[in-house]
From Swiss-Prot:
Pfam families: Exonuc_VII_L, tRNA_anti_2. Belongs to the XseA family. It is found in: Cytoplasm. It comes from Chelativorans sp. (strain BNC1). Residues 493-519 are annotated as: Disordered. Bidirectionally degrades single-stranded DNA into large acid-insoluble oligonucleotides, which are then degraded further into small acid-soluble oligonucleotides. InterPro entries: Exonuc_VII_L (IPR003753), Exonuc_VII_lsu_C (IPR020579), OB-fold_nuc-bd_dom (IPR025824). This is Exodeoxyribonuclease 7 large subunit. It catalyses: Exonucleolytic cleavage in either 5'- to 3'- or 3'- to 5'-direction to yield nucleoside 5'-phosphates. Its main location: cytoplasm.
């Protein structure tokens, strides 16, 4: 009885074809789950198919799920899938009726956790470093004084206000901001496009081309700063023809753009300090250097002026220089007058000698006519010779005045001038030295001949009342007033008329047997 009831219930179950049940399952799964986020490890990824689509699996310890990324979605992914990478896939669940399998159609893909991000970051860092994008040889020096600064950042955050405020305080320059999103899936593409856009600007255009670029963002987590690790951003920074400063995050935050940039700043404010110097310090340095330059020029001019005065004192006076030429000119003028008189007399005698008759004049005229005819016949030949001579002389002059020859002559004359100046300096120095030696010898001779040196040895100079020196005792009269000049002063005296010489007392006789003095 029970078996009969069971058979009746089974006969009431709806009957489906394979296609019907497959499509019913497909609708049920798609309607029930819709969009889901699935965490798993990528397995079986071999790159994009020839059609541009990607097929692989997501797995964990107990299950596996097929996954597909369509061509249009794959081109928009922030990073490509990699074998063995743990990811979080967002997409729609669906089934494929032809094989009775369910799969996830992935619309976005992101690494699962900081560990996966760090692994992906290290892999991307090794790849780009192997291409030489982080090499120090690629980095360019920053301009000392940029006129225009391009900033790639969010136009509404505190970062751009801090940068502009710091630049205004240090050295106000023109700032051009390229607005981008600094967080999200489109960050990498927008930042790369901004760097390339600044480099595409032409000098002198409507928008000025920056002299330096600053890519800036405030601090954040690894996920927040992930857009600045994008491969497109790193390649754009490395290819930038404009020097680039990276100021992403705080001092402890590092991104791949920091390695590709020409300079890394710890903060956006630090990037502004690196980009421009302090105007007040520059003005102070310029003032100090200007004062030093003026002092050096003044000292140099004073030294040259003193040297010129010394040389001028050593040179002879104009009267001494022109004395001999003036005398020669006077002598030549006298000889010229006498020569003119002699020549006039000779011409007058010659004129008297040639006063002849009419016949003599006719003969001389005929002779002059014949000479003129001969000269007329020789004139074309002489003219041609003169033309050839002038042409040859012109060619020689043209060769001499060529730029190369002129430069050689200028160089030669410059060398001769240097040699002449050196010879002049040596001659002046030698003449000054000789004059100094003669002067010193004259001083020593005058000192040796002065009577004062004799007074120093204990002698005295006797003068009479009229201050005339007395040479003999006979010149002194009794009672005459005298003046005696010693080395240290003068005293007065009166002559007594008697000789002051007295006989010396003889030495007493010595007793016999005692030895006396030798003197």
């Amino acid at each position: 009885m029970e078996e009969a009831k069971k058979d009746d219930s089974l006969s009431n179950v709806a009957e489906y074809s394979v296609s019907e049940i497959s499509h019913a399952l497909k609708r049920t799964i798609e309607d029930t789950f819709g969009h889901v986020r699935v965490r798993g490890e990528i397995s079986g990824f071999r790159g994009a198919h020839s059609s541009g689509h990607c097929y692989f699996s997501l797995k964990d310890e107990r299950a596996r799920m097929e996954a597909v990324i369509w061509k249009t979605t794959f081109a928009r992914l922030r990073f490509p899938p990699q074998e063995g990478l743990e990811v979080i896939a967002t997409g729609r669940l669906t089934t494929f009726p032809g094989s009775s399998k369910y799969q996830i159609v992935i619309e976005s893909l992101e690494p699962a956790g900081a560990g996966a991000l760090m692994a992906l970051l290290e892999e991307r860092k090794r790849k780009l470093a192997a291409e030489g994008l982080f090499a120090e040889s690629r980095k360019r020096p920053l301009p000392f004084m940029p006129h225009v600064i391009g900033v790639v950042t969010s136009p509404t955050g505190a970062v751009i206000r801090d940068i502009i405020h710091r630049i205004t305080d240090r050295f106000p320059v023109h700032v051009v901001v390229w607005p981008v999103r600094v967080q999200g899936e489109t960050t990498g593409a927008e930042v790369a496009a901004a760097i390339s856009g600044f480099n595409a600007l032409q000098p002198g255009g409507t928008i000025p081309r920056p002299d330096i670029l600053i890519v800036a963002r405030g601090g954040g987590s690894l996920e927040d700063l992930w857009g600045f690790n994008d491969e497109a951003v790193v390649r754009a920074a490395a290819a930038s023809a404009i020097p680039l400063i990276s100021a992403v995050g705080h001092e402890t935050d590092w991104t791949l753009i920091d390695l590709a940039a020409d300079r890394r700043a710890p903060t956006p404010t630090g990037a502004a300090e690196v980009a421009v110097p302090v105007k007040a310090e520059l003005e102070a340095n310029i003032a100090r250097l200007s004062a030093r330059l003026k002092g050096a020029i003044s000292r140099c001019l004073d030294r040259r002026r003193q040297e010129t005065r010394s040389l001028a004192r050593a040179l002879p006076s104009p009267d001494q220089l022109f004395a001999l030429p003036r005398r020669r000119f006077d002598e030549a003028a006298g000889r010229l007058g006498r020569a003119l008189q002699t020549s006039t007399q000779g011409k007058r005698l010659h004129l008297n000698a040639v006063r002849v008759s009419i016949a003599t004049l006719d003969r001389r005229i005929a002779q002059a006519r014949r000479d003129a005819n001969q000269c007329g016949e020789r004139l074309p030949l002489v003219y041609q010779g003169l033309v050839r001579h002038r042409r040859a002389r012109f060619d020689r002059d043209a060769a001499r005045v060529s730029p190369r020859v002129t430069l050689q002559r200028i160089t030669t004359l410059g060398e001769r001038l240097k040699i002449a100046i050196a010879r002049k300096d040596r001659a002046v120095s030698l003449r000054v030295e000789r004059a100094r030696t003669v002067y010193e010898q004259a001083v020593r001779l005058a000192e040796s001949l002065s009577y004062k040196s004799v007074l120093e040895r204990g002698f005295a100079l006797v003068r009479d009342g009229e201050d005339r020196p007395l040479k003999r005792a006979s010149d002194v009269k009794p009672g005459e007033t005298l003046r005696l000049q010693f080395a240290d002063g003068n005293i007065g005296a009166i002559s007594t008329g008697k000789s002051s010489n007295t006989n010396r007392k003889s030495a007493p006789a010595r007793e016999p047997g005692k030895q006396g003095s030798l003197f």
